[in-house]
């Protein structure tokens, strides 16, 4: 979350970082919400459980069911990041019944990405004293239209996906170009951003409240005495 040129006081559950520094003596700061596991949970479905053979299969499998069937996966394989910062949390699957299928588990893993993003963004906006008006997404998971739509539903704001899905690498290239004079300003670079698809928020349900219950069950699972580096 871009918070301008004044370095903020540390906020509970958030990291303070430098968003960029153009060498003009006025770095731009940001609040960062750290989510430890997102795409790695899809890899776990593939390599650990054998539910899918390719990561690209998770989207169609997750969308083959209307919802997770009450299943929640908290992928706290290495603890929980923002806003909980709980190194003793561990991965949890709750809500399993005899009717649970691999599709429900895949759906719950995809939904966990949505819920974790909502939790981090809500903590960031509280800490920054701002209101979110839209979210721009990128990365491999952003190609899943249904997931991005659910993200818009959970946040209650439009979610915008650019034509270039790997904007982290693109941003590094832009900064290098600024340093070498390829572009004259950040504003000039901003005008190069192009929209692929805009997802407008629709009605959501109370599943996030259930997700928070699942998170509580994952927390403090280990103790300081049993955690081994």
Q: What spans do the regions from the language model cover?
A:
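Glycine/Thr-rich phosphate-binding loops that ligate phosphate moieties of nucleotide
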Residues: 4-229
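Minor-groove-contacting beta-hairpin "wing" of winged helix-turn-helix DNA-binding domains
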Residues: 1
């Amino acid at each position: 979350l871009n918070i301008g040129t004044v370095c903020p006081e540390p906020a509970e559950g958030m990291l303070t970082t430098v968003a960029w520094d153009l060498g003009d003596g006025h770095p731009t700061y940001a609040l960062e919400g750290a989510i430890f596991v997102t795409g790695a949970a899809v890899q776990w479905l593939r390599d650990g459980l054998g539910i899918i053979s390719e990561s690209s299969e998770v989207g169609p499998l997750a969308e083959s069911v209307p919802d997770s069937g009450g299943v929640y996966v908290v992928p706290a394989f290495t603890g929980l990041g923002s806003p909980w910062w709980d190194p003793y949390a561990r991965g949890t699957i709750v809500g399993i019944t005899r009717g649970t299928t691999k599709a429900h588990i895949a759906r719950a893993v995809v939904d966990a990405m949505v819920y974790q993003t909502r939790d981090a963004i809500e903590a960031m906006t509280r800490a920054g004293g701002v209101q979110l008006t839209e979210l721009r997404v990128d990365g491999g998971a952003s190609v899943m239209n249904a997931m991005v739509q659910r993200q818009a539903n959970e946040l209650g704001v439009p979610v915008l996906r650019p034509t270039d899905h790997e904007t982290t690498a693109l941003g590094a290239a832009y900064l290098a170009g600024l340093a070498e004079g390829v572009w004259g300003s950040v504003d000039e670079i901003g005008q190069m951003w192009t929209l692929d698809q805009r997802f407008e928020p629709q009605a959501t349900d109370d599943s996030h409240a259930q997700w928070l219950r699942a998170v509580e069950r994952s927390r403090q699972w280990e103790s300081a005495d049993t955690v081994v580096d």
